[in-house]
Amino acid sequence: MRNNPITSDPVVSTLKEQNQGRIAQIIGPVLDVIFPSGKMPNIYNALIIKGRDTVGHQINVTCEVQQLLGNNRVRAVAMSATDGLMRGMKVIDTGAPLSVPVGGATLGRIFNVLGEPVDNLGPVDTRTTFPIHRSAPAFIQLDTKLSIFETGIKVVDLLAPYRRGGKIGLFGGAGVGKTVLIMELINNIAKAHGGVSVFGGVGERTREGNDLYMEMKESGVINEKNIAESKVALVYGQMNEPPGARMRVGLTALTMAEYFRDVNEQDVLLFIDNIFRFVQAGSEVSALLGRMPSAVGYQPTLSTEMGSLQERITSTKEGSITSIQAVYVPADDLTDPAPATTFAHLDATTVLSRGLAAKGIYPAVDPLDSTSTMLQPRIVGEEHYETAQRVKQTSQRYKELQDIIAILGLDELSEEDRLTVARARKIERFLSQPFFVAEVFTGSPGKYVGLAETIRGFQFILSGELDGLPEQAFYLVGNIDEATAKAMNLEEESKLKK
């Protein structure tokens, strides 16, 4: 741990005499810098350019060394706009990689790729910084136990359980509830696991980043009155920023998460939205650095770059980083190198369905499309596995019968199929759940449902014990006892109406 060489002026001033170069060439966000012989900076070192442009505006640009070209030249990628830079300007080598603030003081704040706060709430109250380029934990440090990461969300825990220290792909279009699901997970990990979350907005729209921040303040995930009680740190590198910033913002968020895992020994949730933009930014940088493109025009180092990020996301004996990554699939082509490389690292997929959202079933997680490598009898146990498989079979049969129902109606089905449809509709509604973060909008209190309660509830529905209850009794409730209580209330209400 050291003082941040980027933001701590005393460090920069001592380096001024030591290692100084000059800009030789500017190619958009890429700079060539000449250094004195024998004083070449290392790969990934941070370089700083300070000065004034032609109209007297202050310039403060940080770059990262990417290539050593020979003849005392290095090629660096800028982390902010290069407007106003000129050939011949002085460049200071900080002698260290980019470092960002870490620790509890980062919670409730918004940072850029350099770890500078951008929320107008003043400086961050910490002197502890970590470099963003770090090795993945050694094999000896890894926790090899396969354990489920309980989220308290029924549909996730039962049908596509998350692995502690695993990586989950989140697939869903606009307006199907991705943000609300993310916020509920942040809320639940804080309450149930005493953990914290880090959100990395990689190549996001600025509006989306702002909306997320506002919604987090409304729902209490970020506590405005006491910022230290917030449950999440936000790191943004928006669409309008240079590719260097978008390529490195994921590492900045991951570095903050690593501190909570390794030093505070906590369980951490790391959100990356969107992992495709990380690949896209790497592709832009690769082209600017003059590398030959590979398949479909992507960078030849695609697998290496993805691996260097993903391998740091893991469980150690101290704590865990469980990562949930939104995955954009270009032109819905799952064989595209970007999503295909991502899939190789995922332990589970959570697919959000527009059809379920249209029915008002939230969270709109598709029970048939969502998958998990953890759903095996030797990991989750025979009871959990058996229940999940029966829920999927019932839902699948209902899906197959929907066309027949639409054309001929329910009456034309066999007695057995009618029973299957009735139970499937109850299951579909019971997979919905009121969220804590949606309380302010819906007025109904949120529910955290333990895994044992979830399994018990679905076993009751599948056994046929609750066939006599109306299906609306299962909509937006927590455990099965609430559903039976709701059924009694509905019955009393209908009697009063008569």
From Swiss-Prot:
SUPFAM superfamilies linked to this entry: C-terminal domain of alpha and beta subunits of F1 ATP synthase, N-terminal domain of alpha and beta subunits of F1 ATP synthase, P-loop containing nucleoside triphosphate hydrolases
Keyword Plastid: yes
GO molecular function: ATP binding; ATP hydrolysis activity; proton-transporting ATP synthase activity, rotational mechanism
Subcellular location: Plastid, Chloroplast thylakoid membrane
Major place of residence: plastid
BP term (GO), one: proton motive force-driven mitochondrial ATP synthesis
Example of a GO cellular component annotation carried by this entry: chloroplast thylakoid membrane
Binding partners and assembly: F-type ATPases have 2 components, CF(1) - the catalytic core - and CF(0) - the membrane proton channel. CF(1) has five subunits: alpha(3), beta(3), gamma(1), delta(1), epsilon(1). CF(0) has four main subunits: a(1), b(1), b'(1) and c(9-12).
Stated name of the protein: ATP synthase subunit beta, chloroplastic
